[in-house]
């Protein structure tokens, strides 16, 4: 069956979006704890609304961190520093409700999970079960240099650029909240050929005109990010299409940790298991196994074994080995998917403790992932973005 030209859309949000504020607070708390106690168990959820931050969750640690201080520093770093923005780091109320991890959950995970993954025997790694059941997906494709789908790649770059021009005062009238969306046209062979539509909504000072925002964003944001050859006379631009976006951030919408899971991953281009990332330490397979699945998929594509690869992992609580591993190359594989699954089993340790060891996940590295995507990042060195297994996979596949 001949494929038709089609459109695909992905969105991103800035670090000042209410849900992303929550992700960054949760991961800032996680990082602060991991910096002092690498073996801490953290499941930290945040919600924000007008003038209020609530931090709740289960944390088991030997250290102390000043959660209200971390919350205020995070909000200040994002740029909510004045009451007229509708949310202010100094004056917002911060409530906390923290318990320890359930003993029933800990029983299935504990065994030998100390800071000695480097010296652990295979039997000890095998003894450490997953912290929950669940399924996780990882994806990679050769549409971009970072092996990510083009729509989400461009949406993230636009969102990041919105923040840059706000913080460096290029467009000093911008305020922290904002969203971007990119629609890409694909040809009959499934290759991206042009950008069809760009949508940007950004919070702004009440006195700036829509015409000024429209002109400035096209010049300083879109032109700076989207390659000229991808845009043409038919490309459509919707800049603040409601005409006004003054009330934003937590004053405009309540926010919650883990509510931007598609923004965090592949923009809807690949499937998602449903688990969120932020605020969770690496014993939570929602996070660590999703990172591992991306690592596997990226190395498969980097090795030239497929143009696209979607990897699914699934776990049972308290059990170390994945209950299933599957690879779907969407018809682009150079070897069979059975061969790819065998290569994955032979070259990647996908047990929870094995993932932590393989990707070195007991470090305070998570706040930097909490805005602009966890995958395809070129601005920070993330272990799951490395392609150090590609040569081995290619050789073992006989290519």
Curated annotation (Swiss-Prot):
Documented EC number(s): 2.5.1.6
Record pathway: Amino-acid biosynthesis; S-adenosyl-L-methionine biosynthesis; S-adenosyl-L-methionine from L-methionine: step 1/1
Keyword rRNA processing: no
GO function term, MF aspect, one: magnesium ion binding
Root EC class: transferase
CDD domains, per the entry: S-AdoMet_synt (cd18079)
Family: Belongs to the AdoMet synthase family.
Name assigned to this protein: S-adenosylmethionine synthase
Native source species: Bacillus mycoides (strain KBAB4)
Upper taxonomic lineage: Bacteria, Bacillati, Bacillota, Bacilli, Bacillales
